[in-house]
């Protein structure tokens, strides 16, 4: 059977890729090993967090689905880093895992131009030169032809789980690994490796003594992840906090030899910023305790997730260490924690469009690229899907820059630097994070989604109204001046005869203070919050914009693909090797490759500025 596009895998990357391509009117097939596990939250029952929440809102602004699914399935909402500046604040929501999964599958099933099929892809159909995709072959011998394929294997490509001495070829507990494509990819010359991740035990709610824990409530004022949603009124469940102690650490230390992580059996690098409890005890010996979050997995389940207690120790040891923790003395394990090791492709093998350099029409996204996390996977899946569709239309790829989005930072880091460990997004990875606030995701990206055809007229009109209203209120603030009769607050005295716009730049004055004086300035919380943040941080934002303009000149110089950098005189040997391997898309990307000197960039700039050599403007966003 023939399709325009095939998506391999039904995880968070696969969902976004399949929806994007089919919504752009291409006949799409998603093939996954188990249709009942589409959109499964394999590890923590939460979406969002620092930088991750920003990415979810960016996905939504571009026309992706993750924001709408979590808005539907959330059971608790919190804004993280509330006490800090807006650049590092981020929304995070606990999810009802089953509800999230069900909604994801339902969305796919109802989507026009999209078919779902349960099978395991074991090989590619390629042209005679073996450098262009023509389809896939499945475990049961089915052949499906297509012009593009998006590969999203998650932890399933030669996945292997570890619990003490127990080993099994699985990508998740009780779910079999995928084999076949690993040999195909190696045969095509892809640079591959092994990575490791892990998950903690789940326990029964009734076995927890919550009186010995700290309660963590959600925020009463919920900010929707999706810009298409208005005010959300949700029932919320509490999370709870407890801590490991000296006895917990002793149990782990006494049994460290039983951990496959330290016995040498696991060769893949684990996530640096989400270590197992064994790793924490070894690497942070000075710490007397580690924080553990007890998180509900849904409204209709008694299972609780022990965030911060990931482990691959034997089950009896896991039981002992859990029972040593206050509040968990009688905790009953329903599912053990485990480590999982899996194959990944070094993302340096990809163009910024996420298309493979070795095989035309093959796009790769998610954990297959060495990233970690649902949000990172979904972001890549969306961009891979968009660019696969643009390839089918014979159009230039859509490349988001580092200055436009966290998604741009994520992909640029992966394809420019590669990775040897699971890559996780942080606000600190973005040079211009004040410009990437979660509340401005629509301002930065929704027009792109609209122009592509992924954002409908209704959503775009709603955004234009918001944009117009923000500007109107700013103008009103510039026109309104503070008079003596307005002053009811001592803090305002020093601002007499100043306009409200400049008064609002004072950190001690809030927009609420000014609305009390002039109620006509009042509007929805979303609009007022954006007005206030835009004005208060205007100076910083303008300085960042000046820097971005200077960097933009480097982004504009597009470098040719498959170029022989050995012919350019003046480049260092290291630069020639790295440019040839990475094949940077722009001069800016070339400058970010580790080990590249400014002199190498100057040589490139002079070479491609020569009229004899081709210089193309890159319409990155």
From Swiss-Prot:
GO terms for cellular component: cytosol. Keywords: Cytoplasm, FAD, Flavoprotein, NAD, tRNA processing. It comes from the Bacteria. NAD(+) binds at residues 270-284. It is found in: Cytoplasm. InterPro entries: FAD/NAD-bd_sf (IPR036188), GIDA_C_N (IPR049312), MnmG (IPR004416), MnmG-rel (IPR002218), MnmG-rel_CS (IPR020595), MnmG_C (IPR026904), MnmG_C_subdom (IPR047001), MnmG_C_subdom_sf (IPR044920). One of its GO terms (biological process) is tRNA methylation. Its cofactor is FAD. Pfam families: GIDA, GIDA_C_1st, SAM_GIDA_C. One of its GO terms (molecular function) is flavin adenine dinucleotide binding. FAD binds at residues 9-14. Belongs to the MnmG family. NAD-binding protein involved in the addition of a carboxymethylaminomethyl (cmnm) group at the wobble position (U34) of certain tRNAs, forming tRNA-cmnm(5)s(2)U34. Homodimer. Heterotetramer of two MnmE and two MnmG subunits. This is tRNA uridine 5-carboxymethylaminomethyl modification enzyme MnmG. It comes from Borreliella afzelii (strain PKo). The lineage of its organism: Bacteria, Pseudomonadati, Spirochaetota, Spirochaetia, Spirochaetales. The gene is mnmG.
């Amino acid at each position: 059977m023939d399709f325009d596009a095939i998506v391999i895998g039904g995880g968070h990357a696969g969902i976004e890729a399949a929806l994007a391509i089919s919504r752009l009117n291409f006949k799409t097939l998603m093939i996954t090993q188990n249709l009942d596990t589409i959109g499964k939250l394999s590890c923590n029952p939460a979406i969002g967090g620092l930088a991750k929440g920003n990415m979810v809102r960016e996905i939504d602004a571009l026309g992706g689905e993750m924001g709408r699914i979590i808005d539907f399935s959330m059971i608790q909402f919190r804004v993280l880093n509330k006490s800090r500046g807006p650049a590092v604040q981020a929304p995070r929501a606990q999810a009802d895992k089953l509800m999230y999964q069900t909604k994801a599958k339902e969305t796919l099933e109802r989507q026009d131009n999209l078919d779902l099929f349960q099978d395991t892809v074991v090989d590619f159909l390629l042209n005679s030169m073996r450098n262009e995709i023509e389809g896939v072959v499945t475990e049961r011998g089915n052949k499906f032809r297509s012009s593009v394929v998006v590969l999203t294997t998650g932890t399933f490509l030669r996945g292997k789980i570890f619990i003490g001495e127990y080993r099994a070829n699985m990508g998740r507990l009780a779910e079999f690994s995928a084999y076949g494509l690993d040999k195909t990819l190696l045969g095509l010359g892809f640079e591959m490796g092994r990575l490791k991740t892990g998950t903690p035990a789940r326990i029964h709610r009734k076995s927890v003594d919550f009186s010995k824990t700290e309660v963590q409530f959600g925020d009463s004022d919920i900010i929707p992840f999706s810009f298409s949603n208005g005010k959300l009124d949700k029932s919320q469940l509490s999370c709870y906090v407890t801590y490991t102690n000296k006895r917990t650490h002793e149990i782990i230390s006494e049994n460290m030899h039983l951990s496959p992580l330290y016995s040498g059996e696991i060769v893949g690098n684990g996530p640096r910023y989400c270590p197992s409890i064994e790793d924490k005890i070894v690497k942070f010996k000075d710490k007397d305790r580690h924080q553990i979050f007890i998180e509900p997995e849904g409204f209709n389940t008694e299972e609780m997730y022990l965030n911060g207690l990931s482990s691959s120790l034997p089950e009896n040891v896991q039981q002992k260490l859990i029972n040593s923790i206050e509040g968990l003395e009688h905790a009953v394990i329903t599912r053990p924690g485990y480590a999982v090791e899996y194959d990944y492709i070094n993302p340096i093998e990809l163009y910024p469009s996420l298309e493979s350099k070795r095989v035309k029409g093959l796009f790769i996204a998610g954990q297959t690229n060495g990233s970690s996390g649902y949000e990172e996977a979904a972001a890549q899946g969306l961009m891979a899907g968009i660019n696969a569709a643009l390839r089918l239309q014979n159009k230039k790829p859509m490349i988001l820059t580092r200055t436009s989005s966290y998604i741009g930072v994520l992909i640029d880091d992966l394809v420019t630097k590669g990775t040897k460990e699971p890559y996780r997004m942080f606000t600190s990875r973005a040079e211009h994070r004040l410009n990437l606030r979660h509340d401005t995701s629509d301002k930065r990206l929704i027009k792109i989604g609209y122009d592509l055809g992924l954002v409908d007229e209704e959503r775009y009109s709603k955004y234009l109204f918001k944009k117009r209203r923000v500007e109107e209120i700013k103008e009103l603030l510039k026109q309104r001046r503070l008079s003596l009769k307005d002053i009811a607050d001592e803090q305002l005295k020093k601002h007499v005869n100043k306009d409200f716009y400049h008064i609002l730049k004072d950190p001690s004055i809030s927009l609420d203070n000014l609305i009390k004086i002039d109620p006509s300035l009042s509007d929805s919380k979303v609009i007022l919050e954006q007005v206030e943040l835009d004005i208060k941080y205007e100076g910083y934002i303008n300085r960042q914009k000046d820097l971005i303009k200077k960097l933009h000149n480097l982004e504009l110089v597009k470098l040719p693909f498959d170029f022989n950098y050995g012919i350019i005189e003046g480049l260092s040997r290291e630069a020639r090797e790295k440019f040839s391997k990475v094949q940077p898309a722009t001069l800016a990307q070339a400058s970010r490759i580790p080990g590249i000197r400014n002199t190498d960039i100057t040589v490139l700039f002079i070479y491609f500025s020569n009229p004899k050599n081709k210089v193309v403007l890159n319409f990155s966003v």
